[in-house]
Amino acid sequence: MALALLEDWCRIMSVDEQKSLMVTGIPADYEEAEIQEVLQETLKSLGRYRLLGKIFRKQENANAVLLELLEDTDISAIPSEVQGKGGVWKVIFKTPNQDTEFLERLNLFLEKEGQTVSGMFRALGHEGVSSATVPCISPELLAHLLGQAMAHAPQPLLPMRYRKLRVFSGSAVPAPEEEPFEVWLEQATEIVKEWPVTEAEKKRWLAESLRGPALDLMHIVQADNPSISVEECLEAFKQVFGSLESRRAAQVRYLKTYQEEGEKVSAYVLRLETLLRRAVEKRAIPRRIADQVRLEQVMAGATLNQMLWCRLRELKDQGPPPSFLELMKVIREEEEEEASFENESIEEPEEGDGYGRWNHEGDD
């Protein structure tokens, strides 16, 4: 919605949105002179500009400023963020063909769906655009009208075509809405498998969740190898933003993890699995022997009753070792059987209790 705010602000100030920037995330207690000092240093490559206004954005608890560029500027020179005092300030700007490219993709999509632009506006509850007026409207105005229609339409507008990723920037000071890298990576690894689109579209959707250094890295790896896959992109993110834990450290951490007091064996195995996968990812443990290593560590690190020990020993001797789910099934079955036996023992009356149903009937 930041781009929509930029467009509305430019319209109010009667300035060209293609020659304007909006900088957000500025601490609320900053004076205009302090803001100018930071911007003059970080935006000096853009030439002369004019600060048109400042507003407070409640949802960010921070200020935003609008700048008008007074010289022709190479859009590639505009940074996506600047390092301000107290954190990163985001730079919002509009590319020259952003509206045209968007509308071209929109028209192509509507054609495939057998729909029209005017029909889409009607579905959104906006009656001001008809099939006769669409050809006469500029791309900029049409994009603006579409933004207005979507803003006032009932939610959700359409069923989700794909699950979106949470935001990740890789910045030293992450924004409140960002996920930690490990959480974002786990989510991304699973979700990209669900996207029923081409690799190129997957990379575009992945880039939509990125900001700052993370987005810069995405551009770098794609420029270096245009045919790079989404999985290879995620691998690059691991190399740059992932944990610095060494292979040896990952291996030792796994082998030194034991069942805790009061912890069920199944809970221990689940906790152990996270460490095993991390060790496999770092190639500290070969993937081909992961099942064997898992079984051996459970037998060494857990407190097992005799029945479960025998079952696991039998699985180890017979081979091949069970998978994670197969092992969990065996353990859960044994835990349920043990719990059932304990309940029966509690309910069974002790000798001498009850109504004497086993007394000899012939006794006087």
UniProtKB/Swiss-Prot annotation:
InterPro entries listed in its UniProt record: PNMA, PNMA_C, PNMA_N
Subcellular location: Nucleus, Nucleolus
Region (Disordered): 335-364
Keyword Nucleus tagged: yes
Nucleus keyword on record: yes
Start-end of Acidic residues biased regions: 335-353
Keywords: Acetylation, Nucleus
Superkingdom of origin: Eukaryota
Sites bearing N-acetylalanine, chain numbering: 2
Pfam families assigned: PNMA, PNMA_N
A Gene Ontology cellular-component term: nucleolus
Major site of localization recorded for this protein: nucleus
Similarity-based family: Belongs to the PNMA family.
Name of protein: Paraneoplastic antigen Ma2 homolog
Originating species: Pongo abelii
